[in-house]
Amino acid sequence: MTATPESLFPTGDELDSSQLQMESDEVDTLKEGEDPADRMHPFLAIYELQSLKVHPLVFAPGVPVTAQVVGTERYTSGSKVGTCTLYSVRLTHGDFSWTTKKKYRHFQELHRDLLRHKVLMSLLPLARFAVAYSPARDAGNREMPSLPRAGPEGSTRHAASKQKYLENYLNRLLTMSFYRNYHAMTEFLEVSQLSFIPDLGRKGLEGMIRKRSGGHRVPGLTCCGRDQVCYRWSKRWLVVKDSFLLYMCLETGAISFVQLFDPGFEVQVGKRSTEARHGVRIDTSHRSLILKCSSYRQARWWAQEITELAQGPGRDFLQLHRHDSYAPPRPGTLARWFVNGAGYFAAVADAILRAQEEIFITDWWLSPEVYLKRPAHSDDWRLDIMLKRKAEEGVRVSILLFKEVELALGINSGYSKRALMLLHPNIKVMRHPDQVTLWAHHEKLLVVDQVVAFLGGLDLAYGRWDDLHYRLTDLGDSSESAASQPPTPRPDSPATPDLSHNQFFWLGKDYSNLITKDWVQLDRPFEDFIDRETTPRMPWRDVGVVVHGLPARDLARHFIQRWNFTKTTKAKYKTPTYPYLLPKSTSTANQLPFTLPGGQCTTVQVLRSVDRWSAGTLENSILNAYLHTIRESQHFLYIENQFFISCSDGRTVLNKVGDEIVDRILKAHKQGWCYRVYVLLPLLPGFEGDISTGGGNSIQAILHFTYRTLCRGEYSILHRLKAAMGTAWRDYISICGLRTHGELGGHPVSELIYIHSKVLIADDRTVIIGSANINDRSLLGKRDSELAVLIEDTETEPSLMNGAEYQAGRFALSLRKHCFGVILGANTRPDLDLRDPICDDFFQLWQDMAESNANIYEQIFRCLPSNATRSLRTLREYVAVEPLATVSPPLARSELTQVQGHLVHFPLKFLEDESLLPPLGSKEGMIPLEVWT
């Protein structure tokens, strides 16, 4: 190759533009009436970043960039302009505006770089053609403008003229895409591919920096503890937005780290705090990031700008809020509740179809082949197929799964990850944690485009789908013959059955009874693992919620925090294959591209339980919200939960939910107020075991701590109430479960309805819905990770409370009335008035119905658990007697017509004469007690 003559390359001191003629160039124009925001880069651009040296498309096409030199700063009197003056340049691009400060020499360096770029491009044949014949809307020649010569600072008028010269110089350059998109220009303007994405908020602060390695406040990520002594400096491009900062690799453009602002946020300048000359230190709860600037003045400027940005729309995340939550209450939020999986899954499916950018999912267990709308007649509503279709459309799907201890749990998250990752490159799945731990990621969350979020007790997994019918059988039609079998996979496609004539609601592993048999062989999803001809399924009752707007942003931020935390802490996820995620700005949260029907206007606050092992920070705002809501309730509490392990003794059990309930009832009793507490629990814990022989060690361990909370021992709720008021406790609290019946094999069958809900309703005005059980695992924060929302009504409607007129919240009232209606069988009793939950007549009806139903079920099925079996000996005698359902099915059917709804009393005397703690020699007995509580 012929050497380039050195004379073609300017030294940077020459500012003569005579050899910089341009034939023509495009002129940025917008159509009349066109909004510049419509041309800005889409949010998905964050996943397609390029090297900062390859001239990526930074500016929105057709949207002009304008500059204005708005002032100067002199910081050394008597010096020359080129060394003592900073020019403040105000730039505008559409709705974005920002200020950069430059010395005169920065203009000189830019001028030199653009000259070199012009000369180099003219030497390349194809590039020369592109320069000479670039499209134009005007025929006028354009040339590289000249810089004013540097000289001594003169009068104010002279300084103003220099500002105008620089302003005109820059504006002429910015009309030419040949120079405007060159990396030297974008670096000078402090812009990147992340600058003009509306959902990321305002432009923010950007620039080239040197950052120091380390500083992570995560065990194992620092070389020598917190005060790291072995580190390296790396050159990166820093981007600061209103609630986070990030830095990018210059060579690839990939995001190398994201630091979310939180209550630990602090910015410091100086060698004492940074151990670096011209250093800036940015602290959050997760990391202490140290940057090195070119001068102390630049360090002060950057620190000031970062602090001001953090005080903008993202300032909510710089402090803890009510209940010590990371998120504040968000008024004006559209929220909709779901009872049972049918409605929840269908709404999730509809939201997935509307996704345009991102889908976030985190679950304790996720079954890729679960159907979201049923009965399924094709694969259109199968979760993995839906995610694959959206990924093919360009939507980015990020999934976080709990990585279980395989010897203890059979949810096979490894299979779920492999099955999903093979579908499309846009689907990314991470599992956490790697280390063996006693605790779990128990939260359930799905977020679409960071504007709509689902959460509650429902995993997108087998066994969760149900409706208000709580069917015990699924034989596909009215026939109960053995010939009625669910569809089996086609020979040519072993993973997918033929569904063209399907009438089944639960296919393969979805037909389940978790006490009869736990799930096995999950990699064979369409094969039954229990005999549906002889074994009834166990109905699944659960509650979920969907929220829009700002709370969805808060929930997305939680997911992003966990995702980025996992990526940072696990070596296998540090590759660019797993991208860092970025939270959208709260400033655009109310621009909803879609909403789900049925939402009601409420105030919503996101709550969570997290610890350093799970998310890098500690929070137990769910517990705080439970305690506060119970303490401040005036009329009643309605609690549905999978577990109820509480009443602190300061040693084994630490949460005080049960204690607050006792205190609130005692206060009402002392003051003579009408106050009710309704508690609904599953009649048995959801572990595999033969209850006819006592249920197995796992079932008995949970029963032990449940009864310890409810009625056994000095710390229990009923023991403390009886000590204070005798039998009057029955006027204040009701503890029940749910049961149903059906037909299978020609005779009646019964099964408990497994309550998996995690919901609290107070006074028909306040609701807590989430994934958190009432136990230490879910509530302390240091154990399982959980999510919940506190929903407060802002719209009311007339109702009743203890016979008096009462303004009830629409969200809470509608949810409570729906729950009561299904539980009490209101569909067969149109005269049942559910408005007043605490009057004597209603409370007595509730208690009588629970007692009557329990007696009928015991008489017909001799079902367990039962108050008649207070020891293992009486249990053996009890199950030895043939039930009426087997001896005389016709008589049993006749008696069952008297059952109303599903409500039954919780058997408080079941095995009360036995010690239910696991034997010390058993594997369950060797597990720490904290696992059960």
From Swiss-Prot:
Residues 437-464, 751-778 form the PLD phosphodiesterase domain. Signal peptide: none annotated. It is found in: Cell membrane. One of its GO terms (molecular function) is phospholipase D activity. Its EC number is 3.1.4.4. One of its GO terms (cellular component) is endoplasmic reticulum membrane. Phosphorylated by FGR. Pfam families: PLDc, PLDc_2, PX. InterPro entries: PH-like_dom_sf (IPR011993), PH_domain (IPR001849), PLD-like_dom (IPR025202), PLipase_D/transphosphatidylase (IPR001736), PLipase_D_euk (IPR016555), PLipase_D_fam (IPR015679), PX_dom (IPR001683), PX_dom_sf (IPR036871). Residues 65-195 form the PX domain. Interacts with PIP5K1B. Interacts with EGFR. Belongs to the phospholipase D family. This is Phospholipase D2. The gene is PLD2.
